[in-house]
Amino acid sequence: MYVLNRKGEEEDISFDQILKRIQRLSYGLHKLGEYPACVTQGVINGMYSSIKTCELDELAAQTCAYMATTHPDFSILAARITTDNLHKNTSDDVAEVAEALYTYKDGRGRPASLISKEVYDFILLHKVRLNKEIDYTTHFNYDYFGFKTLERSYLLRINNKIIERPQHLLMRVSIGIHIDDIDKALETYHLMSQKYFTHATPTLFNSGTPRPQMSSCFLLSMKADSIEGIFETLKQCALISKTAGGIGVAVQDIRGQNSYIRGTNGISNGLVPMLRVFNDTARYVDQGGGKRKGSYAVYIEPWHSDIFEFLDLRKNHGKEELRARDLFYAVWVPDLFMKRVKENKNWTLMCPNECPGLSETWGEEFEKLYTKYEEENMGKKTVLAQDLWFAILQSQIETGVPIYLYKDSCNAKPIKNLGTIKCSNLCCEIIEYTSPDEVAVCNLASIALCKFVDLEKKEFNFKKLYEITKIITRNLDKIIERNYYPVKEAKTSNTRHRPIGIGVQGLADTFMLLRYLYESDAAKELNKRIYETMYYAALEMSVDWLQSGPYESYQGSPGSQGILQFDMWNAKVDNKYWDWDELKLKIAKTGLRNLLLLAPMPTASTSQILGNNESFEPYTSNIYYRRVLSGEFFVVNPHLLKDLFDRGLWDEDMKQQLIAHNGSIQYISEIPDDLKELYKTVWEIKQKNIIDMAADRGYFIDQSQSLNIYIQKPTFAKLSSMHFYGWEKGLKTGAYYLRTQAATDAIKFTVDTHVAKNAVKLKNADGVQITREVSRETIQLNQRYSKCVSFKSNNDEQCLMCSG
């Protein structure tokens, strides 16, 4: 049997040569022992005559990836093998890579540069220093699935062949941001290379390219309630989606069904047919040749006369002509609606064509205008507020949406001097002003919190977090200048207000590394201190980075009046950790460069690249699947796997039990209680505590946060209790998605039948006990709002705060 080397020559297969290579790449890994020989044997077993050496490498990587449930270091070894293979097929000269990307021609011989001329010129000018600074050894710190994510979507290709290495990508991104400052470019490169933070996906996609559209989020309100206005807005959405932007669009100003059209003496068809056109546009414009589908979130206020039809648009049943399932839906909820639901009062549906101004007002002004229209009998229909409430909840239970945000909180706490904010973005963490002349924009980056844990001292390094946050603040501000804007209204808004959005990933990993239980007082205190540090650092940098005065719309803003985010929450923040009094004096003296700063977002792709748990969320499971082109792989929570491995508890039987219990360890008798407490999944953590932690960090988040809600078996009572609790806590985002678990488990073909049956038996037996262990506080919450759910619910339910 022989292999074909990269020159196409035949070579005899050498077991020893394969083994030596795997052993060479196993440096620094934790107690792999005899496993390299097992990997080598697995590779030999999967080989065939005339296999290419690059295919042999991929086979070795896949073998290691399958063994990752034996020990987490196998995922790193798999990535190292894949990386080593990439190194053999790509250049280690930065200028040579830039040359290939810049001089690329398409199939017809036309110039089709993949990087911009100024980036190319910059690299040629500084090639000696760049080649000296770039560190390819950091490639070997990615795990297999992080590397595969980069390989699949992020690294630039020519004729479907990967040209970039991950370090080339990070260098391209850094240069694209700091084209005028090599020192700052290299500083950013090294920090990203060391995985302290990452810029958002659109920045990784497009920085340094001929059209560097690096912004993640775009918010629009309709140009006008007319054919011209609707299709101008649709064109804006298409152009934004084309360049990888996620979209939030407010449609509450579009007239409802059967509303009179004065210009044609006709009758409106309402929102549904219009949204089907937006739906098809989202499907068609897929962000650059299939990178990812266009994504739009459509916002509406609950007084709109088409609200019931709106809530059905994503459902799986019903007439197809009344469905638009590729859009995401959101409700922009005024406090008055929540009050009416709580008091079981009527709610009037209105058409914006006949009752103008509702979307332009909030708080007391909105309530006065709304009740005035009611008194004048201007509404289209009157319903019980609770009937609409339960329609919203039913849609959330069936589809996970609508996304749920509180209009008055969103307008009261970030900015008040520009006008009424009408919507958020796709992921509901951006709170910015929009108008027909302004498309709101936000550039994002996320900090990998687990990198700030000192494992020896079991301490969190707040000083380093402060330093990194300041660097990210400067980077995101520079992107505003360097960015390519797909529509002129976006540039107008972004240069006028200069908002940015800094988020996090790996908060759950941080707690686990510090041995903090997610619901513990220590975790709650750390949660607050992290965001206080980030907010302080970002504000301070926004003061220090002033170059030509504050941002254009600064005068009249809360910041110009000495009011910061925590002041709007009426929260008392002392100078124990940071000198807020001094910072307020600096702001009063010089102003701020940026309107908004913090916006914890979902980090689905980038956290997978860096190998962290997503955003600020708990782990949803301790075992899950990862899919790549070569197949499906089990991945175990690496912290849990290391603990079980160190205690001699990890073996094939433990793996089988973990799969049988859907990633929960609460019912596995061999696992000690301290680990059961530390490795609770989100389904085993009280939602009340998750909401409390969201409110605690909310004092320091001037935009909002993508807060998912997790309920195993959602019901009206549980959802009502959760929504009202979050509303009363003052959250801006009440719920991004409602996440639920399937009513029945999928058949686990890989699990021993006896293990699976025993898992079900244990869970059912323990379920009785869990149900009884409802806190008094939770019962009181449920009783407090029983009035608004009692006539709809026939079940004796426990509150969702227990996640029972």
From Swiss-Prot:
Residues covered by the ATP-cone domain: 1-92
Annotated GO biological process: deoxyribonucleotide biosynthetic process
GO MF annotations, alphabetized: ATP binding; ribonucleoside-diphosphate reductase activity, thioredoxin disulfide as acceptor
Cysteine pairs bridged by disulfides in the record: 217-442
Pfam families recorded: ATP-cone, Ribonuc_red_lgC, Ribonuc_red_lgN
GO cellular component, one term: ribonucleoside-diphosphate reductase complex
Entry keyword Oxidoreductase: yes
Record: residues binding GDP: 216, 425, 429, 603-606
The keyword Aminoacyl-tRNA synthetase is annotated on this UniProt entry: no
Reactions catalysed, as given in the entry: a 2'-deoxyribonucleoside 5'-diphosphate + [thioredoxin]-disulfide + H2O = a ribonucleoside 5'-diphosphate + [thioredoxin]-dithiol
Subunit details: Heterodimer of a large and a small subunit.
Protein name: Ribonucleoside-diphosphate reductase large subunit
Organism phylogeny: Eukaryota, Sar, Alveolata, Apicomplexa, Aconoidasida
Gene: RNR1
